[in-house]
Amino acid sequence: MGIAHTEWESVIGLEVHVELNTESKLFSPARNHFGDEPNTNISPVCTGMPGSLPVLNKDAVRKAVLFGCAVEGDVALFSRFDRKSYFYPDSPRNFQITQYEHPIVRGGCIRAVVEGEEKTFELAQTHLEDDAGMLKHFGDFAGVDYNRAGVPLIEIVSKPCMFSAEDAVAYANALVSILGYIGISDCNMEEGSIRFDVNISVRPRGSRELRNKVEIKNMNSFTFMAQALEAEKRRQIEEYLSYPNEDPKKVVPAATYRWDPEKKKTVLMRLKERAEDYMYFVEPDLPVLQITETYIDEVRQTLPELPHSKYMRYITDFDIAEDLAMILVGDRHTAHFFETATMSCKNYRALSNWITVEFAGRCKARGKTLPFTGILPEWVAQLVNFIDRGVITGKIAKEIADRMVSSFGESPEDILRRHPSLLPMTDDHALRAIVKEVVAQNTASVADYKNGKAKALGFLVGQIMKRTEGKAPPKRVNELLLAAMRDM
């Protein structure tokens, strides 16, 4: 990046729109469901028909409160809705109902691990609002689908408290994980049920100023998010370095950009509107939203154990590697799978590795995730137990795992019963003969081992396992090999 670039840092904040998985929309009884025929899930409220009046969805309020509790935010006893006016084909009323001045949640935080370091990212606020419709382009014309118009959203606004693309991606991952655990959204990026807008400015390292921010709209993958932030950081720094004596506000004006993944650059969409351009005013058709402390406490009691707490428990109670613990808790279904497996297997480290590495890789190759394959947690526990008890070798265990993923309906015990050829070598006399032969043919390695070169033992074990096609019990191989070398 060059020496000059290293003297600058990013300042990043995220605005995340999350569609709530309610049965109906935020202010109308119309169905809230993705993928239906265009303009079939609408009502007069959705399309802004004269005389139609909004009625607030109680379940959407509960889900917003639940999120506020999950992030330890301050849930407001009194909040209010406002009209945000703008003119666009996907907004039939020409305004959005949002919470501009009095959001339902203020504050809160998201905890994440960034490159091995635990960080806490502060939230500014979370507010309820309704979604817009969707423009669909067909060659030389466009249509509008209002099925999405009125779908309940929470917009989660962070403080400008991230200073690298790695921070932003870790924050986004942790946020998605929390939303999944509390079950208020499916967070499907491809369907647009969670949308990330990132705000970034740069400043000289050590400065506390906040310069004009650029918003990059609708990041639909974490990879693109990281790439866009790095590219925009470079662009802004180069602009400031090119015009060192100009007013910074003129060098990098506040604007909205999009990410072009093919050109690997951010592309200007429009200059930023000011708040007054939206002509905010109090929504006249909705009363103040009042919530009691008792209601908030009742909602808080329904919170499950959250990812960060679970992560710390896995490291402490199960003594598993931090990177594997992070993978396990990232998805509540995977975490549940692991915890169920621990009831049958106490080798937690091996279990975590088999779930997050061996089985995860095999399932991904088939477009699946382990908890949704039909493979039972008890079967993975059984596989690890078989290895620990010497029933099978690690090599054979991987063959069994291949068969488990291929069939999605057989336990290790079932597979061994149907394929006895997978069982380990039990002929001790034959194994002794192989060990004796390997020792006789590799006298140099034997001498190296006796002279203190521990790697030589691994080489000799490898030769024996190769000749037995991985079926020799490793523990017995070591016993016989050491005995054979002592007798030389």
Curated annotation (Swiss-Prot):
Enzyme class: ligase
Classification via SMART domains: GatB_Yqey
Catalyzed chemical reaction(s): L-glutamyl-tRNA(Gln) + L-glutamine + ATP + H2O = L-glutaminyl-tRNA(Gln) + L-glutamate + ADP + phosphate + H(+); L-aspartyl-tRNA(Asn) + L-glutamine + ATP + H2O = L-asparaginyl-tRNA(Asn) + L-glutamate + ADP + phosphate + 2 H(+)
Listed GO MF terms: asparaginyl-tRNA synthase (glutamine-hydrolyzing) activity; ATP binding; glutaminyl-tRNA synthase (glutamine-hydrolyzing) activity
Gene3D superfamilies assigned: 1.10.10.410, GatB domain, N-terminal subdomain
Keywords (A to Z) from UniProt: ATP-binding, Ligase, Nucleotide-binding, Protein biosynthesis
Record GO biological process: glutaminyl-tRNAGln biosynthesis via transamidation; translation
EC number: 6.3.5.-
InterPro entries, per the entry: Asn/Gln-tRNA_amidoTrfase_suB/E, Asn/Gln-tRNA_Trfase_suB/E_cat, Asn/Gln_amidotransferase, Asn/Gln_tRNA_amidoTrase-B-like, GatB, GatB_C_1, GatB_Yqey_C_2, Gln-tRNA_amidoTrfase_suB_CS
Subunit structure: Heterotrimer of A, B and C subunits.
Biological role: Allows the formation of correctly charged Asn-tRNA(Asn) or Gln-tRNA(Gln) through the transamidation of misacylated Asp-tRNA(Asn) or Glu-tRNA(Gln) in organisms which lack either or both of asparaginyl-tRNA or glutaminyl-tRNA synthetases. The reaction takes place in the presence of glutamine and ATP through an activated phospho-Asp-tRNA(Asn) or phospho-Glu-tRNA(Gln).
Family under the similarity heading: Belongs to the GatB/GatE family. GatB subfamily.
Protein name, entry field: Aspartyl/glutamyl-tRNA(Asn/Gln) amidotransferase subunit B
